């Protein structure tokens, strides 16, 4: 008997929408995908012309009403990357979308695919009343996978045998957790003392600098590159992990309440078990003192951004 199709609703406008849907189609997920955007009809028709080649999934134009029984809502907002669009206007737009989404009785998972995603996730939680485990951002999922690949290349082994994490927020506010990085079961830092021909402190420093240059969200650089493919690849992967209930450990943006010594709840990227219900379990790493200090500083930055928005709006409840 064929499995019931899952339902994905894409709300908000972004130049990533179509590429994200295309990447999901390549995964052959049995899904109904709805685009809630007044300019989506052309995109939907384009996908439907090729429907012979993606029979597992169907694509439709829709309204916010489609959120009522959606498994996942993917939340885009290109205005977050637009310098001409004020922070206050962005908050108003987020609130409007969330209220429309929740008015349908939505109770699924929200994937936040915007710039400043941890701030947006906190706003979505506040405006929606959804449990924190049902709101997830891309966090440092891309940076972590790239980190593992680069280490694998240094040691000339498979990335599948590298266990390491990038945590924090995005852009420069990320932390390579060297104290918890392993090749198989062997700590990578042990190679600095035992096998400096294979890896040096300079190698680690260069890799750390490289990781901070990974864009947190697509932007256009001087060559016109918007770094879209890497973003939608991890977004589609996260979608698959949830819809297939894979219970995988991913470094994504989740609300941390008491772990890591943080003083108040904040969305930040750390390892968590992700499945059909969203965040199944938070995995608290045993960080070094320096890593712990850096994480607290990053969490404070996110909290301060939310406080500024609250002051500017006279309260954002």
Regions found by a protein language model. Give the residues of each.
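C-terminal substrate-binding/catalytic lobe of Rossmann-fold NAD(P)-dependent dehydrogenases
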Residues: 128-134, 143-317
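Short, well-ordered alpha-helices that flank and scaffold nucleotide-derived cofactor binding pockets
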Residues: 22-26, 49, 126, 153
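Rossmann-like NAD(P)-binding element
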Residues: 53-108
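NAD(P)+-binding Rossmann beta1-loop-alpha1 motif at the extreme N-terminus of oxidoreductases
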Residues: 1-44
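Conserved N-terminal Rossmann-fold NAD(P) cofactor-binding segment
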Residues: 3, 32-70, 308-310
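Rossmann-like NAD(P)(H) cofactor-binding subdomain of soluble oxidoreductases
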Residues: 85-150
């Amino acid at each position: 008997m064929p499995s019931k199709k899952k339902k994905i609703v894409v709300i908000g406008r972004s130049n990533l929408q179509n590429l994200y849907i295309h990447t999901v189609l390549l995964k052959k997920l049995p899904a109904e995908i709805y685009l809630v955007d007044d300019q989506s009809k052309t995109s939907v028709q384009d996908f439907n012309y090729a429907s012979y080649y993606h029979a597992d999934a169907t694509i439709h134009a829709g309204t916010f009403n489609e959120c009522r029984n959606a498994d996942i809502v993917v939340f885009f907002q290109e205005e977050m990357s637009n310098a001409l669009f004020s922070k206050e206007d962005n908050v108003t737009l987020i609130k409007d979308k969330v209220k429309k989404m929740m008015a349908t009785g939505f109770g699924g998972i929200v994937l936040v695919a915007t710039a400043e995603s941890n701030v947006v996730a906190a706003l979505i939680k506040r405006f929606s009343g959804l449990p924190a485990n049902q709101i997830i951002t891309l966090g440092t999922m891309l940076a972590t996978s790239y980190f593992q690949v680069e280490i694998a290349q240094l040691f000339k082994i498979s990335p599948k045998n590298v266990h390491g994490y990038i945590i924090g927020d995005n852009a420069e506010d990320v932390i390579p957790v060297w104290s918890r990085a392993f090749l198989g079961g062997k700590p990578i830092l042990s190679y600095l003392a035992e096998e400096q021909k294979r890896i040096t402190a300079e190698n680690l420093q260069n890799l750390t600098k490289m990781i901070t240059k990974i864009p947190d969200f697509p932007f256009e650089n001087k060559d016109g590159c918007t770094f879209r493919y890497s973003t939608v690849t991890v977004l589609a992967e996260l979608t698959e992990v949830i819809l297939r209930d894979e219970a995988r450990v991913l470094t994504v943006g989740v609300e941390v309440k008491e772990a890591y010594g943080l003083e108040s709840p904040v969305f930040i990227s750390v390892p968590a078990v992700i499945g059909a219900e969203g965040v199944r379990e938070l995995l608290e790493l045993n960080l070094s003192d320096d890593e712990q200090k850096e994480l607290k500083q990053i969490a404070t930055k996110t909290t301060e951004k939310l406080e500024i928005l609250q002051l500017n709006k006279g309260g954002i409840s």
